[in-house]
Amino acid sequence: KGHPFEYREFDKEGRVTIRDYSKQTIENFNKLKLDCLFVLGGDGTLQLAHQFFELGLPVIGIPKTIDNDLVGTDYTFGYQTAVQVACDALDRLHTTGESHQRVMILEVMGRDAGWIALEAGLAGRAHIILIPEIPYQLEKVLEKIHLRKEGGSPFSIIVVAEGAKEIGKDAITSEL
């Protein structure tokens, strides 16, 4: 695994040298008499494929993202699996949250799109769902938790997409 345009090599002292192996990659492609490079991947992989395309390599890019945020598609590769895994986790969190009377939080993928959080949260009976597309007010989240407790439900399940953010603030992941 590596980036052929910026491949990192380490010497015995731990120093890093960055080398460009793109020409060698194209030479090997031609030596093997290949017709086309099929690339299945996300943003980074397809950007890399585009660099090869710009150098004259015939490329077909097939987008893959579990975020389900590609225009013109109903579902993307990996999305339904991600939702199923999140639903399985929510089933387990329900049991623990209810028996121990706790607030349980499940963070799922979704830097810019909250589809996984939304679908898994609805299917998995989450009480609160936070997504990047709709900034939230922390006070409202706390209010919902307290209302549930006052109403006889001493536990809450929250699903948070990784890109969810409070109104007027950056996403939590931007601080890391």
Where are each of the predicted segments found?
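Glycine-rich oxoanion-binding loops at beta->alpha junctions
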Residues: K1-L37, F77-A89
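Generic secondary-structure boundary/loop-capping signal
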Residues: G2, D67, D74-T76, L106, ...
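Short, small-residue-rich loop/turn micro-motifs
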Residues: H3, G56, K64-I66
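A short acidic, glycine/proline-enriched capping/turn motif at secondary-structure boundaries
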Residues: P4-R8, G44-T45, D67
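Short, conserved acidic/polar surface loops in the N-terminal third of protein domains
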Residues: E9-E13, L48-F52, V71-T73
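N-terminal entry module detector
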Residues: R19, L46-Q47, G61-P63
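Accessory alpha-helical/coil subdomains and C-terminal extensions
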Residues: N28-N30, V39-G41, Q47-Q51, P58, ...
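Acidic/polar active-site rim loop that often engages polyanionic ligands
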Residues: I62-Y75, E98-S99, A123-G124
